[in-house]
Structures are given as C-alpha cells and as structure tokens.
Amino acid sequence: MKEKYGSAELRRDYNQVCGIILREERQKRNISRDNLASGLLSGAALGKIESGKAGWRMLMGTILLQRMGLIPENFEMVASSDELERWRKREDICLLIPDRPSEAERRIQEYRRSYTMREPGEEQFLFKAEFILRLTEKGDGQGIGAAEDLLLLAGKAVSCTIAGDWEKEMESLLLAPAEMEAILLVGAAEMLCGRKSKAKSLQQAVWKYPEAHQWKDRAAAGILPQAALLGMTLAMEEGESRLAYEQGRKALELLRRSFRHSYLLPLLKMLEKIPRQELDEEERAYLKQAETFRDTFERIYRQYDYPGERIWQGISVENIGEAGVILKMLRKFSGKSKAKAVYDGEDQVVTVRQLEKIESGVHKPSFENYQRLIRQYGKQAGWTTAMLETDSAEVLELRQEIASLVALCQWDQVKWELEKLRRKVNPEYPRVKQELLFLEALLVWKKNGDLGKSLEMLQEALKITAPGLDGGDKKWWVYQREETIIAGNITEILRKLGRPEKTREWLEILQFSLKQQKGQTGIERRAYDILMEAYDNYLGDMKQFEQAIKASEEAACNYLKRPEALVLDKAYYRIAWNAYEMAEEVPSQRNALKQKWREAFRISEVLAAFMYDEYIINFLKERRKKYLF
C-alpha cells in the first residue's frame, strides 16, 4: 500500500478493507474459500464478505479470523443488539461454571428456549458448557455423566463446526480456539474411558497446532493453557513430572507475556500438583514463584467475588459496538431529530418508526442502510473496521505490539517500532495519519517532556477522525478506541498543565460516552483504562482520596472481566498511593489505611512481576521503603 491515493479513495468502505485482509491472509496460506468457511457459511457467502458486499455476524466473523490465527482485537466491529444480548447471556453462563452448576444448567436451558435459531458457534458453546457441567457434577465421569455419554456430548460439540473425519485431518483443518477446546473435551472423555493413548494423541494435536500454523503468541494464548491442563493431567497420571512441568511452564509463560488471566488459576493449581523430585533448583524456584502468583490472584478474585476458575467464550466485546446505540449517539451528537436522521442527503433510507426500532435494538439495519445512515455524521461505515487502513495483518500486529510497548512505558522501543510502522503504511489514510501523529505526540511528552507541544499534536490527531467535534454535543460522540485513547491523554496533559476545569469537562465527556457504548454487555470499552488513570490522578489532585480508591477498585474489578489484565498492576498501585495520601489527611484512619496500602502495594509488585512489567517493577522498587517499612 505504498502508492498515492486521492480523497475519493480515502473515503472507501472500511469493511472492504477487512475483507481484503481476510482474502490476502487466506490466499497467502493457500486456503480455499470453502475450506475457511467450512461449517460456518458457504464459500460464496464468504466471497461476498471478502469483496465488501456483505457484512458478517460477530460470532461467525470472530471464528473466521481466529481460524487463520488473526486477532479480532485488531478490528473494531459493529453488532446488533440481539448478538450482544446473546453474548451477555453466554457470558453469564461462563461465570456460573463450575461453581454454580444448577444455575448454569438453568441458564443453558433458558438460552436454548429463547433462541431456537442458533449459529454453529453458539451450539458448540452450549454443548461444551454442558460437558463441563456433567464432568464437574460427577468428577470421575460416572453415573449420569458416564464417560461414554461425555464422549458423545463432546463429539456433538466438535461436529457443530467441523465436518468429516476430523481426527484424521487435524493437521489440515482450519480451527479457532473455541473449536480446539471441543477437541480437547473429546480427549478428556477418551481419558475417562481409559483410552489414554488416544487422549494424548488429541491433546498433542491441539498443543502443536498453533506453532504448526505459525500463530503469534497472542493467538496461541487462546488455546495452549487449556491444552496444557489436559496434557499435564495425562503426564502426571503416567508419572511424567517433567513433561507436565514443561507444558505447564510454556502455557504460563504464554499467559504472562500476553498479559492474560484466562484459565490462569486452574493452570497455577495444576502446577502445584507436580512432584518436585525430578526438577532442578531453578525449576523448583519457578514453581515457588507460581505459588505466589496463585496466592495473589486468589486474593484478587476473592476481593471482587470473581470466579477465578470460570470458563471463557474466547470472544471479547471491548472493541464491538451496538449498531442502534451508535446511530442514536451520533444523531444526538449532531442535534438531529429522528425525522431528519432518516435521510441520506435527499433520499430517505428508513422510516422514522424503523429508526426508532433500530435505535432501541429491536431491529438491525441492513448492511447497506447502516452504511448510508452513519455516513451523514462523517463516520466510515462497515460491520468491521481495521484499526488502521491496511491490507496487511502484519501491520495490524505491529500496531498492537507498539500499543503493548506504550502500556509498558518502553519508549525507546516504541520509537524504534514506530519507524518500522511508518515504512509499512500510507500516511494519507486518516487512521494511519492519526496513529502516527498520536505516537509522535506521546514521544514528545514522555521522552522530551514538552507537554504543550504534545497537547497540540494530540488535539490535531483527534480532529483527523472527528473534525466536527466542536460543532456538536461532545459527550454523545461515539469515541472509537483510538479516539478514546487520544482524548484520555489530552485529559491527562490538561491536568498536568494545571487546568482542572477543562480536565473535569473531558472526564465527564468520556465517562458518559463510554457508559453509553458499554450497553448491555457490561464490559468496558477498550481504552477505559486510559480514562480511569486520568480520573484517578484528577481525584488525587483534588484530594478526594476516598473517591479515588473506590474508582480504582471499580476499575480493577472491570479489568478482571477481560481476558487481558495488563493494567491491573497500575490500578493496585493507585489504590496504595491514595490510601497512603488519605492517611496523611485523616490520621484517625491511619491503621486501617496502612493495611490497605501495604496489601495493595504488595499485590501490585506481584502483578508487575507476573506480566514482566519492568517499568512498574523498577518504579515500585524505588517506593518500597515508603509503603512497606
């Protein structure tokens, strides 16, 4: 994408770009449309998605991306109210398993009754959930949950999206993590049936799959921990302690370097069961550290009454917006009545009644109508939008790597990777131009300390995709992921420049907008952490320490709802800082607050070590004496 483009081409449909990425990655791997689409949709339907002529449903689209090792979080998606409602109900089931089996079983049956028309991925999820329930109810697989019955149930889960003699074709199949989980359940059932050799063969097929298909670590982290749990069980039953250790350590390191806590607690508990006799001193020390991680995460989960051994869907919604909510917010931002908002120029797109139903979530607009309705507000349309205008998944991965480096405050590496990104993209595209300017502004701030210049650059970057922001009601603007990050950094610089009124104005704007976008999922949008850090700092400036502690504890609780927990260590440090400062203001509460700040500080230390967050590790070392002695 190195040639020049005109303004008309810059306004091209972003959904087409995502289709191009899908097609390019498919062709690069020499995969036919029929093979990629197998079990989900027809090859012809996939062709329409690749050409940008059709959109996709959230669940199906996620599986398509994951089958090629692509990370859905590199895209922003739009879904219907129905899709997000279904996601929420599946998430509620996940939170109940394995601790509350009766309630989980009731919710599963409710789901089946409520949604008689289900996608293959939904049906697969329900079968997997039922399998785990039966397994946990009868731990040895006997009685109602007899091993052969479990095997039949696991087979049904696999066949929802995988056709044919899949056991003989594993190497050539295109599989998403959710599909491989179903195969692992078949392996678990075979183990319970006494066929350990077959169970091991299936476990190894899944264990080796990500590397064989050249998946990046972030993609592999979605399945290797689950594979390790079965592999470690099999290995220890056969007395192979070292094999169990090696698989467990590899899976744990993958979670640590991906900043994830999904399936972390079961993995840590399994590591504790490994006999130490065959391990050397370094390996035993590693397991000792793993025990510290287990203690800390159990403490965190108890603090927020969060089910640490829950199951996960493998589908995140932090980057997914609801079509009706987006249209409603943009209409309110522009001050348009419903009667005016139904027009695309001179042409009426939908009736007022239809728009009301769309905004309320009763109806989802057609792909074409959604495009026409949203463009009147200056937004690019599409069910799926790449984080940058590129036809390269490699570029999107590089952008995500830079985002992780920013979160870890590795500014020299950010600068290096930014130059690499610059050589791979076309700066004429709005999102690319915005990303480059945003990263440059961060470096001006973090490396040069020039707050004023950085503020100007950030404000300019925000205007690239939100040029009419000053002309509408800002709190109703649909701040997309990068816009929220930029606006959050603007807020923090305004605070540092001593402009509290402007800081509070931006905080209220972003809090309102993100609350609307959260909708019925209950999951905060990506970049929520940027907002909460700025909010905490503002409350500290105002000496509202008790409110700041509550805000950081609320943020920590929300971070646990995501598979990734990258900023959890920073949230706990903020709790420690605010408790310490509050004790200075309220000496009568010092003893209780001292206990709070010491515990929060220690948790922050362990979390920073868990995630290899060197910046926070060193930051905390410098302050250890203050908080712990």
Where do the model's predicted regions map?
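"A position-specific structural signal for the A-helix of alpha-solenoid helical repeats
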Residues: 90-91, 122-133, 184-185, 223-230, ...
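Short alpha-helical DNA-recognition segment
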Residues: 27-48, 332-357
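Helix-turn-helix/homeodomain-like alpha-helical modules used for DNA recognition
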Residues: 84-137, 393-448
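DNA major-groove recognition helix of helix-turn-helix/homeodomain DNA-binding modules
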Residues: 57-74, 366-384, 628-629
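Alpha-solenoid helical repeat architecture
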Residues: 76-89, 118-125, 161-181, 214-226, ...
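Structural motif corresponding to the intra-repeat A-B loop/turn of tetratricopeptide repeats
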Residues: 29, 98, 137, 193, ...
